[in-house]
């Protein structure tokens, strides 16, 4: 019985571990998903954004006053996803915030595309404005076999 309990705890700990992408692996996924140049945002800018928002961690969560940011792109629960806790959430991406925490980036990418279609575009991300805007971001994809 004790062995089963230890095994169950080990399996549980494995299932909740985050996927932390290598920058080049992440860049390849974005490129394959049509993100390079999407709405004028270069692949290097997307990679820079994710580096500074989550350090490429799919399980990144940051709590703000009145909302929470989720996943590799730090999608906000006030405007883009539904976490069931944020009052008056818009949920413009029509998704649960939980799906932004798994290793499948397809919904994260689709929601990020939705964010940049809004008037603010990529400027919606504070980390992008602080670390990527008007900077040489080529280093974020340098050496990647794209």
UniProtKB/Swiss-Prot annotation:
Entries under SMART domains matching the protein: LYZ1
Gene3D superfamilies: 1.10.530.10
Assigned GO CC terms: extracellular region
GO BP annotations, alphabetical order: defense response to Gram-negative bacterium; defense response to Gram-positive bacterium; digestion; killing of cells of another organism
Domain C-type lysozyme: 19-146
Main location: secreted
Function: Lysozymes have primarily a bacteriolytic function; those in tissues and body fluids are associated with the monocyte-macrophage system and enhance the activity of immunoagents.
Family assignment from sequence similarity: Belongs to the glycosyl hydrolase 22 family.
Protein name per its UniProtKB record: Lysozyme C-2
Organism name: Sus scrofa (Pig)
Lineage summary: Eukaryota, Metazoa, Chordata, Craniata, Vertebrata
């Amino acid at each position: 019985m004790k062995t089963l309990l230890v095994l169950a705890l080990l399996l549980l700990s494995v299932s909740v571990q985050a996927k932390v992408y290598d920058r080049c692996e992440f860049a390849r996924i974005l490129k394959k998903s049509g993100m390079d140049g999407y709405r004028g945002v270069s692949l290097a800018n997307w990679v820079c954004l994710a580096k500074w928002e989550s350090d490429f961690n799919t399980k990144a969560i940051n709590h703000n006053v009145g909302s929470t940011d989720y996943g590799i792109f730090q999608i906000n629960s006030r405007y883009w996803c539904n976490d069931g806790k944020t009052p008056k959430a818009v949920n413009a991406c029509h998704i649960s915030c939980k799906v932004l925490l798994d290793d499948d980036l397809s919904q994260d990418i689709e929601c990020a595309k939705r964010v940049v279609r809004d008037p603010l575009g990529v400027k919606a991300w504070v980390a992008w404005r602080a670390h990527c805007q008007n900077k040489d971001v080529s280093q974020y994809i340098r050496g990647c076999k794209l």
